[in-house]
Amino acid sequence: EIHLHPMDIKLSEEGYARGEEARAWYAKSRGPVRNPEATEEELLALVQKNGPVRRIPMEGGTVFELGGRTIEVIHTPGHSLGSVCLLDRENRLLFTGDMCNDSLLLNCGDSSSTVKVYNESMRRLWAREKEFDFICLGHDALDKADKTMITDYIEATDLLLSGQAHGEKGRNALHGGTGYKYKRVLIWYEPERLV
């Protein structure tokens, strides 16, 4: 089962068609960060074959129980149009996934939001900052992070939207395109998709 925002169902179905290939790439590119002692063959052995999957729509505002925790879904379009963050009020944690990490991708064509929509999502999260003490990022971040990373993204996108800053063409180990580095964050975006 996959619980996801309805706006990401089609994207999930398209990605699932090449899921084994994507998981193999992920194992090779990210696996060494989490398990540096493993060989590439050992990492690839962890990649599972595609099987049947049921997609369950999950809207913003949904509240559910997960392992004794009450979780609220917050719809935050950005990396994908159906991106969500998960608020664990009791433990004062906000799970941001791909919405807030050290390298944000908004350059995925029509499956990503504009910079303006992303900025609005981050402002909605920050308006609730009294409800969480830390954020839990996606991918390689295994520890809790300083929640003010959200304000870095707000400031960076404000600068891009006002024309006071511009990204540069570039590439890092995993991504490429137009990127803008600001304080602790890096935004990959499409200049023609600011607003």
Over which residues does each language-model region extend?
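Accessory terminal helices/loops
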Residues: 123-195
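Residue-level marker for buried hydrophobic side chains located in beta-strands
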Residues: 2, 93-95, 136
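Short, solvent-exposed loop/turn segments at secondary-structure boundaries
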Residues: 16, 106-110, 147-149
